[in-house]
């Protein structure tokens, strides 16, 4: 996810994206512990996306 995509989103869209990414991270961690996850780099990529979304949310709110 690029920062330019997030810049154009509203607070509601960013909040929804944050929830979506958090659920995806939960599923990836579950797959990791059950041995089904092949691409472990996906976890860190999703965590970075969550951080980007949270950064834009704090900019908008505050």
Curated annotation (Swiss-Prot):
One of its GO terms (cellular component) is cytosolic large ribosomal subunit. InterPro entries: Ribosomal_protein_uL29, Ribosomal_uL29, Ribosomal_uL29_CS, Ribosomal_uL29_sf. The keyword Ribosomal protein applies. Gene3D superfamilies: 1.10.287.310. GO terms for biological process: translation. Coiled coil: none annotated. It comes from the Bacteria. GO terms for molecular function: structural constituent of ribosome. Keywords: Ribonucleoprotein, Ribosomal protein. Belongs to the universal ribosomal protein uL29 family. This is Large ribosomal subunit protein uL29. It comes from Geobacter metallireducens (strain ATCC 53774 / DSM 7210 / GS-15). The lineage of its organism: Bacteria, Pseudomonadati, Thermodesulfobacteriota, Desulfuromonadia, Geobacterales.
């Amino acid at each position: 996810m690029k920062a330019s995509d997030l810049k154009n989103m509203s607070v509601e869209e960013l909040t929804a994206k944050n929830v979506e990414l958090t659920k995806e991270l939960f599923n990836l961690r579950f797959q990791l512990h059950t041995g089904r996850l092949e691409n472990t780099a996906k976890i860190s990529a999703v965590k970075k996306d969550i951080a980007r979304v949270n950064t834009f949310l704090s900019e908008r709110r505050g």
